[in-house]
Design a protein with these regions (language model features):
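Catalytic-domain carbohydrate-binding cleft regions of carbohydrate-active enzymes
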Residues: 1-278
Length: 278
């Protein structure tokens, strides 16, 4: 691959969207997503298969809270054991709010989240925000004051694009009291799906985007993925992107509230086996 960007970090998650279905159904899906992720990881650990390295990221704490309310004591212990092991990631974001949510409510939910997770030996230091362009200063302060030091954002490309026309950029967001939050201004929350990292999807979220192509003459999705990555990473460099890594969020399927997909780790391993020395 002819770019200096040699590492792509994948954030495998289920985008939390409580407006796409009955909220009871959305809650059921996310509780089940967590249980599925736990089963995938435990299978890998018990059988020493690639699934032992599977990582599932809970985009919002609301989903975790619903799971904990439904889980048995053993399930809770197993869940946080996998968090401590690094197989499950937690986010300090309660839900993907617009700026109508007030600071007091956000602070209370974030503090409650941090208290619960810390009691299980898994304090939260990162947060993820997806599909909502922008976050209020009250939301920023609620994160900072409750021990969150890093915020990873994913834009909604239908309602707006990248600030200052620059994507994949970090910046410090400083509060009035001088405390700071490191923010990564990321891409769309299904970038990995659009690139073709899941062999069952290669659909662009932006119809004007020239980078996502499928070679109809070549059914091998790994070659398509390689071409898509080359185009995308080259475009970053042409735009002055200074780092040797990039980040892509990816869902199990190209949908909101999607389940975990263990095929992803096999796809990544297959890609690295073929192209990892480039």
């Amino acid at each position: 691959m002819h770019t200096r960007i040699k590492t792509m970090y994948l954030i495998h998650h289920s985008h939390t969207d409580i407006g796409t279905d009955l909220q009871e159904q959305v809650v059921y899906n996310h509780v089940n997503n967590i249980r599925q992720a736990m089963a995938i990881i435990q299978y890998g650990i018990e059988h020493n298969t690639p699934e032992k390295d599977f990582v599932w990221n809970c985009e919002t704490y609301y989903c975790v809270e619903c799971f904990l309310n439904a889980a048995s004591a053993d399930e809770k212990e197993t869940f946080f054991e996998l968090v401590r092991r690094g197989n499950i990631g937690l986010s300090g974001t309660y839900l993907n709010f617009n700026d109508l949510a007030d600071r007091g409510a956000l602070f209370r939910r974030t503090a409650s989240m941090q208290k619960t997770c810390t009691e299980y030996g898994a304090p939260v230091t990162c947060a993820m925000n997806a599909d909502i362009n922008g976050i209020s200063m009250g939301g920023r302060d609620a994160l900072i004051e409750n021990g969150i030091s890093f915020l990873y954002t994913n834009i909604h490309t239908h309602h707006g694009m990248y600030p200052l026309y620059k994507n994949q950029r970090p910046y410090w967001w400083e509060a009035e009291n001088g405390k700071r939050l490191l923010v990564w201004n990321g891409e769309h929350y299904n970038l990995g799906n659009a690139l073709g990292l899941n062999s069952n999807t290669n659909v662009s979220f932006n119809p004007n985007e020239p980078f996502f192509q499928t070679d109809a003459e070549n059914p091998d999705y790994l070659n398509n993925l390689h071409a898509n990555l080359e185009h995308r990473l080259s475009a970053y460099e042409a735009d002055g992107y200074p780092y040797d890594f990039a980040i892509a969020s990816i869902s199990g399927v190209s949908s909101d509230n999607a389940p975990p997909n263990p095929a992803l780790i096999y796809n990544v391993n297959a890609f690295n086996a073929r192209f990892g020395n480039e």
